[in-house]
């Protein structure tokens, strides 16, 4: 019987670079408090957020992803023609079709390559990174551009005191390719659909079309439920990722959790028993929660500020809508 040929790729892969894009407009807590009964102190004490970035009207998920991708490609010392695949993690590409990925690939000049979106909420970047890593190891792509890009500000009800101060906009991403030593550990991922309503769009699009003069859809969040789930369940996921990578907690140099809430991140760091001197990303303070963009944005920030350096061992944990989660151990790329 004729055998179908198989593909195989390199054993050792890693992150070749990281690129980011942050919109120019900085939005303070005080500005948001003009629409709600709250204060800068109250918001900061409960979330760790002081400011966040909102994209301009003419900026889109695709345009921000393109800027972040352009920087990531340049920092890797590559040309767009060297990229074999583009994966965009997003939940805020405001077209049902076509996907964001092909437009980003075309804008970058990566012509003819596979390009697609992954929608897994705030865990999206980790999902996309897991898919990209498997593609390179499997030999179906040599270099994959993985992007997280979100424009969440239009999805938020600015009179909703429970979450209008949480979400924000931005994009960042990495190039995945062959490296001399192993730079990406196995992906640990999963979901809990029984809690799907904890982070949700409150009105179905078909229901909205039936009542176009009624209230429009918004993003809603059951903050207490998500806090409990993330703070007390995601530590187990992080430990599983370290076990899968053959790494001990005291060997982790940098902790890069999804930037949802600084209090959650502090609880996770303690439960994971990381070293006291391990760097804990806190990009949320001035960036807010950018969903699928938050982990690569935080990665870019710790490298740019010198808090971390290339080659440091980092634990990534993403979690959010679905509810979905993911974790990996990686070596940080050059900043």
From Swiss-Prot:
Any one GO BP annotation for this protein: fatty acid biosynthetic process
Domain of life of the native organism: Bacteria
InterPro entries: ACP_syn_III_C, ACP_syn_III_N, FabH, Thiolase-like
Catalytic residues (positions): 122, 258, 289
MF GO annotations: 3-oxoacyl-[acyl-carrier-protein] synthase activity; beta-ketoacyl-acyl-carrier-protein synthase III activity
Localization, UniProt: Cytoplasm
Record keywords: Acyltransferase, Cytoplasm, Fatty acid biosynthesis, Fatty acid metabolism, Lipid biosynthesis, Lipid metabolism, Multifunctional enzyme, Transferase
One of the Pfam families matching this protein, by short name: ACP_syn_III_C
Quaternary state and interactors: Homodimer.
Free-text note regarding domains: The last Arg residue of the ACP-binding site is essential for the weak association between ACP/AcpP and FabH.
Functional description taken from the UniProt entry: Catalyzes the condensation reaction of fatty acid synthesis by the addition to an acyl acceptor of two carbons from malonyl-ACP. Catalyzes the first condensation reaction which initiates fatty acid synthesis and may therefore play a role in governing the total rate of fatty acid production. Possesses both acetoacetyl-ACP synthase and acetyl transacylase activities. Its substrate specificity determines the biosynthesis of branched-chain and/or straight-chain of fatty acids.
Family under the similarity heading: Belongs to the thiolase-like superfamily. FabH family.
Entry protein name: Mycobacterial beta-ketoacyl-[acyl-carrier-protein] synthase III
The organism of origin for this protein: Mycolicibacterium paratuberculosis (strain ATCC BAA-968 / K-10) (Mycobacterium paratuberculosis)
Gene of this entry: fabH
